[in-house]
Amino acid sequence: MKKCTLFLFLPVFLMLAFPIKTFAGDYLRGDNNEDGTVSIADVTSLIDYLLSNEWPNNPFKPEVTTFTANGVSFNMVKIEGGTFWMDHSDNYKVSLSTYSIGQTEVTRMLWYAVMGTDPSGFKGDLTRPVEMVSWDDCQQFITKLNSLTGQHFRLPTEAEWAFAACGGNLSHNYVYAGSEDISIVAWYEENANETQPVATKAPNELGIYDMCGNVWEWCQDWYGEYPSGTYTNPQGPETGTSRVFKGGSWHSPASNCTIGTRSHTGPENQVNHRGFRLAL
């Protein structure tokens, strides 16, 4: 009986005696689920964390700004600037200034509100990501959106996309955007056969949804081999014949949905598994 009591008491003692640093940089003293009390649920979450090294909830509160275009609202998440390695060989180091990125992919609803058309191959739920849009189409959409809002929206650069996907300064270095388990954060070929409504899987460390799976996402950059060295706010090659897209889709195997995967095609190309998200 004494051993059992000690086992139950020890996690509570550790929680109260030692602050726990979460990936959000906050120090919590026991109330891990932020419900105002320290309970057995908090003890369980601590034990799960110690065993898995993956926090059971996301205490980080993203700084979100909401914009509206013709009655349709969408959110942009602030990404604090930082420095990271773009490749896996420590040859390409990137420093980024602070920027914002779409909390979700651009939806059919937002596209229709701005353009008055719906090019998507998949219909149904209007909160599905728009697809069947080329890079050129995205530029036309952004021009009209900026006229409506008075803002300066754009596509993210590949570096901005990658930094946001990996969790920015709060990164846990997951293979996928927000988890080592793709099924938690992504719609891909094993759990979907078409696009799905945005933000129905778990977000990543920054509170951003669907950066892996659902639809591939256009980036601003021309495609080219990564350079070597350290760069600040890189824009990619000055010229090219194809544009970068990232993230994988509902049509992709897990291996194509990793944060590091990159692909490219001509800016006029349209398919039903590629869309985009905004940057600002």
Residue ranges of model-derived segments:
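Surface-exposed, flexible coil segments in extracellular/virion-facing regions
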Residues: 121-125
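Alpha-helical segments with a strong preference for the paired helices of cellulosomal dockerin domains
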Residues: 25-26, 32-59, 112, 136-143
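Functional-site microenvironments in short loops/helix caps that host divalent-cation chemistry
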Residues: 132-261, 270-272
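Bacterial N-terminal signal peptides that target proteins for export
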Residues: 1-9
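Sec/Tat signal peptide C-region and signal peptidase I cleavage site
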Residues: 18-24
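Short, structured beta-strand segments at or near domain termini in extracellular proteins/domains
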Residues: 271-280
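Bacterial N-terminal signal peptides
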Residues: 8-17
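A short glycine-rich, aromatic-capped structural motif
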Residues: 69-120, 134-136, 212-213
